[in-house]
Amino acid sequence: LHVMVLERGYVGAPSHFRLLIAGMRPHPAAEAYLRLRTLPAEQAQVDWSHFGHLQIGRARRPLMAFVMVLSHSRMVFLRFFLDARMDSFLRGHALAFIAFAGVPRVLLYDNLKSAVLERQGDAIRFNPTLLALAGHYRFEPRPVAPARGNEKGRVERAIRYIRDSFFAGRTFTDLDDLNAQAQAWCLGTAADRRWPQDGALSVRQAFEAEREKLLVLPQREFALGERVAVTVDKTPYIRFDLNDYSVPHTHVRRTLAVLADEHTVRILDGSAELARHPRCWD
């Protein structure tokens, strides 16, 4: 357009021309948002958030926060992990359900790989491990629409609140100390804040009413633990998550299985346990 008007005798500056054109362009219609209202125990929102790194010995581990928020009462569950692997994701759910003493009926997720492997429009292929967890606890996993982060605004705001009210300026000795402080904060400061739907009530009071309507926890625990196949070379060690763990020398040049949780690494040959080691994070 600028070239065209120059050919017709326009002598103004390009910046002035851009201002003139900007005033003539049609503006996109403002998008309206509905305020989210949920029934007690109807929904929770889940997300990961990165909180920097921890130096453990020679290793620099990411500090990841698993956050779950009950959409009705705004009760927050917070747990820090040294990774965002699937086992940590599942463990965060299990610990949150224990903390809430029940399970919400719907869990809302962003389209993270731990929840959604593939999505084409409304056709969703869930992570089968998450579906197994959902079947065990009887909740419905539900991803938000792509580029619709506002649909899980409760957990996004909770993460900002965690950064400002809990994490900023906090000191801790190790991950266990940080998680102990996080638990105390969730049950104290975060629970005592004003409930947004009724300023006369606290989040704690709203949660006490909501807790009665949560789904009952199953009698047996969900089987947690990361299981991976590993190959033993000519030396009697396997490599798992940046560290070497010993196995009996009789099992060199074999394919074995590792079953690991936060604290322990077990090495299996079929169902037989060959070795058990404390998990090393450095």
For each of these PLM feature ranges, what is it?
Residues 78-106, 280-282:
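Active-site beta-loop-alpha junctions of metal-dependent nucleic acid enzymes
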Residues 159-262:
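Active-site-proximal acidic segments at structured loop/helix or strand boundaries
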Residues 109-110, 120-121, 139-163, 176-178:
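RNase H-like two-metal-ion nuclease catalytic core shared by retroviral integrases
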Residues 123-141:
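Two-metal-ion acidic nuclease core segments, chiefly of the RNase H-like superfamily
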Residues 6-15, 19-76, 84-92, 224-240:
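Mobile-element integrase/transposase regions
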Residues 262-282:
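C-terminal, non-catalytic macromolecule-binding modules
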Residues 80-81, 118-123:
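Short, solvent-exposed loop/turn segments at secondary-structure boundaries
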